[in-house]
Amino acid sequence: MAGPVLTLGLLAALVVCALPGSWGLNEEQRLIQHLFNEKGYDKDLRPVARKEDKVDVALSLTLSNLISLKEVEETLTTNVWIDHAWVDSRLQWDANDFGNITVLRLPPDMVWLPEIVLENNNDGSFQISYACNVLVYDSGYVTWLPPAIFRSSCPISVTYFPFDWQNCSLKFSSLKYTAKEITLSLKQEEENNRSYPIEWIIIDPEGFTENGEWEIVHRAAKLNVDPSVPMDSTNHQDVTFYLIIRRKPLFYIINILVPCVLISFMINLVFYLPGDCGEKTSVAISVLLAQSVFLLLISKRLPATSMAIPLVGKFLLFGMVLVTMVVVICVIVLNIHFRTPSTHVLSEGVKKFFLETLPKLLHMSRPAEEDPGPRALIRRSSSLGYICKAEEYFSLKSRSDLMFEKQSERHGLARRLTTARRPPASSEQVQQELFNEMKPAVDGANFIVNHMRDQNSYNEEKDNWNQVARTVDRLCLFVVTPVMVVGTAWIFLQGVYNQPPLQPFPGDPFSYSEQDKRFI
């Protein structure tokens, strides 16, 4: 009798050992079987007791790296950790029954998820790329902290580039459940037995990588509820994380602004070139081409928008307009410089204004003309006396005496070879003969004097036109330089005074930062 009983006992023990979930399982496996097999857990059902109940889902965001902001694509790339928290009453257990296990780490495809996605993503991927484990506590509290690299859309305001700041946001909501099924909120923490919502983007100083182009000014988090949208719509509520970032302009100042300003101010050197220099126009056109190249480079760096003109674009356009005017001025100056009395007449009003009034106002100096001194007058009168004596001498001497005067004196010859010409008996005849002989010389001298007088007048008139061109050059220098300085300062001071707001939201004095917690 004892044999059959012993055999039956051994068979029963083998059957019990063969049953799943009996022996050979650790406490976690036994707990998982208890939750998912024995209690019949269904991940497709919301963790609520009744249909009208809502699931409270709390969110927080930890920023580990602001990777880049591509202005052309209007895309913000960030490396974040998005923290989900909710309560699933079906995943509760008594820790004493399962070896004091208080937390389980489960794959996310085993439990219910609220399906929170980034609405304003820019790559069409709504799901989180890396599905890390879900932490389930014995009270039913569930947390899920998956890492993600988000490419979110960020509208770019290029008005004050490169002294701009941008307001980029990450908008999270559930595309599967409406406001009647889940309630979104900000995650809460406790401090001194008091709880407060995390109304900011969390940044771990040890794990955060600073961006070389942008600095974070504000990082607020806010729950947005739109009462005008029905609750059965997925757009009724969302949790938005705002990143207000300011550009670090040093790179653009060194590589774009300083070269642009230096090239633009080179246009003032055109007015220091001589009026007859044809390179005046060449220099101005070279500056214009350089500005066009910089404008082309900037247009490739910014989005193609017609909403606003960037600050550096305004400066380049201002400089190009000014340089175009300088080119026109150079052509006018060259035209004035090469004018002559035979083609243009310089009126007295223009002469007085450009040769007397403006040069005094512009502090221009003109070489003074040398006045004939008394010595020159004495020299001229003595020369006239010598000429008269020479004419009288030559009229009384015969030609042979004039030719052999020195030889006759040397050989002691006192007798003339030819009889000297006797002066006429009548003075009227003498004057008539002298007049007839000297008339051609006088006419030639008068012609030379008149020609020299006309030539001097011509040259003087031409010099006056040159002086007018020089005065116009100096006047344009005195006009263009202040306009360039004032215009440059006015344009760039707009960017210097373009600062982000002191608070994240206009009209809201709250700073939404760790230093300004709002306890509940």
From Swiss-Prot:
Ranges annotated as spanning the membrane: 249-273, 281-299, 315-336, 475-493
GO biological process: regulation of membrane potential; skeletal muscle contraction; skeletal muscle tissue growth
Pfam family, one: Neur_chan_memb
A single GO cellular-component term on record: postsynaptic specialization membrane
In-chain residues carrying the UniProt-annotated modification Phosphotyrosine: Y393
Entries under Gene3D superfamilies matching the protein: Neurotransmitter-gated ion-channel ligand-binding domain (2.70.170.10), Neurotransmitter-gated ion-channel transmembrane domain (1.20.58.390)
Disulphide bridges, residue numbers: C154-C168
Keyword entries, A-Z: Cell membrane, Disulfide bond, Glycoprotein, Ion channel, Ion transport, Ligand-gated ion channel, Membrane, Phosphoprotein, Postsynaptic cell membrane, Receptor, Signal, Synapse, Transmembrane, Transmembrane helix, Transport
Gene source species: Mus musculus
All ranges on the Cytoplasmic side of the membrane: 337-474
Gene name per UniProt: Chrnd
GO MF annotation list: acetylcholine-gated monoatomic cation-selective channel activity; transmembrane signaling receptor activity
Sequence similarity: Belongs to the ligand-gated ion channel (TC 1.A.9) family. Acetylcholine receptor (TC 1.A.9.1) subfamily. Delta/CHRND sub-subfamily.
PANTHER family documented for this protein: NEUROTRANSMITTER GATED ION CHANNEL
Name of the featured protein: Acetylcholine receptor subunit delta
Membrane topology: Multi-pass membrane protein
Extracellular topological segments: 25-248
